[in-house]
Amino acid sequence: MKSCPKCGQQAQDDVQICTQCGHKFDSRQALYRKSTDEDIQTNNIKMRKMVPWAIVFFILILIIILFFLLRNFNSPEAQTKILVNAIENNDKQKVATLLSTKDNKVDSEEAKVYINYIKDEVGLKQFVSDLKNTVHKLNKSKTSVASYIQTRSGQNILRVSKNGTRYIFFDNMSFTAPTKQPIVKPKEKTKYEFKSGGKKKMVIAEANKVTPIGNFIPGTYRIPAMKSTENGDFAGYLKFDFRQSNSETVDVTEDFEEANITVTLKGDTKLNDSSKKVTINDREMAFSSSKTYGPYPQNKDITISASGKAKGKTFTTQTKTIKASDLKYNTEITLNFDSEDIEDYVEKKEKEENSLKNKLIEFFAGYSLANNAAFNQSDFDFVSSYIKKGSSFYDDVKKRVSKGSLMMISSPQIIDAEKHGDKITATVRLINENGKQVDKEYELEQGSQDRLQLIKTSEK
């Protein structure tokens, strides 16, 4: 279609004269327009053929760009560079993220210790070189899947392993720090509270029992902590150093504000050793000159006293108070008994015991003769006056006499004797009918006119 230049009437391309106004169309102009339309149509066909190739080319360019982008962030070398940069820049949060596993969460403070440990025990330059060489060898190897970076002393500090692939093309490298268990062994039941893996943690350790407090990556640690025992609460640190261990555990050194008490007793020579006690803050314990008591918090006063027995009587020292300002890690204190008071009492009791022993010697000499006469004559009356009527021992001896099973005794010796009111306990060594020496414990009752009678007996 074409338009009349004079009136604007539409006409077919092959029409020579306008039907509206009679204008004669130029035939050369129509021919030119036809040629131009054919060229445009030809060019359009060529363009349509080129579009798919252009799209393919564009996609290839995008794929190449994407590949290089992925390689920059996901190749083994790129993964290595991320870890190296984090360590070089002391990026503890990034290192914590890279080293954390499902089973062991690493927090930023632990990562900070780890970074310092690498720089001290390997050296940053050497670590980077070892890491790059290890990754390169693993990446090229078809058999090896893991290797370790070590400190100058030969301890493993980082495990590098192949763990599948990333985006099909790249080996996925895993960086894992080996762990050890720090262990405590307190003298008494202790509760420890500290932060680990980004969370508050509580560990309860029984007395004299090895107890792990968790899993930690290599480093030299000084962890703020609180501990609680029967003696009080303590603020301080749990310290441990991987350099000091060649096993799967590392010993913890406790650094708390605590005082340990060494006690010396004076004036106690007459006291029974097994009866000596020390009371610290109302808690009574057996005394030993070689024992250290504690620990106790250094921020609280301590009260302390001692006690012991002599001849059945308990003697005590004065209670002393150790001010918090005077407490040290090792604190010594001396407690004094009234030695004159103890010696006077012991002397008095020994006189009484000697008098009592003499009575008992006389009593058991007669009792042994009466016992043997009752056995020989099968007559309980010989021995009945020595035993309290109505007691179980009275009935037992009477029955033995009637059955002829009473044991003969001789040579009684008084080993020990104590009197409590009208009751007397005596340890007597004698010879039985088989000629064997035996120790027997007797209980006697002292009646009117100091008359002694047996109540019961037992083998020592």
Swiss-Prot record:
Do the record's keywords include Transmembrane? yes
Q: Where in the cell is it found?
A: Cell membrane
Q: Which UniProt keywords apply?
A: Antibiotic resistance, Cell membrane, Membrane, Metal-binding, Transmembrane, Transmembrane helix, Zinc, Zinc-finger
GO molecular function terms here?
A: zinc ion binding
> What does its record list under induction?
Induced by cell wall active antibiotics oxacillin, D-cycloserine or bacitracin.
- Recorded GO CC terms: plasma membrane
Q: What top-level branch of life does the organism fall under?
A: Bacteria
Q: Which residues lie on this side of the membrane: Extracellular?
A: 71-460
* Topological type in the membrane: Single-pass membrane protein
Question: Which residues does the entry place in the Cytoplasmic compartment?
Answer: 1-49
List the C4-type ZnF regions, as residue ranges: 4-21
Q: Which GO terms describe its biological process?
A: response to antibiotic
Q: Where are the transmembrane segments?
A: 50-70
Function according to Swiss-Prot or TrEMBL:
Plays a major role in decreasing resistance to glycopeptide antibiotics.
Q: Which family does it belong to?
A: Belongs to the TcaA family.
Q: What is this protein called?
A: Membrane-associated protein TcaA
Give the organism the record lists. Staphylococcus aureus (strain JH9)
Q: Which gene encodes it?
A: tcaA
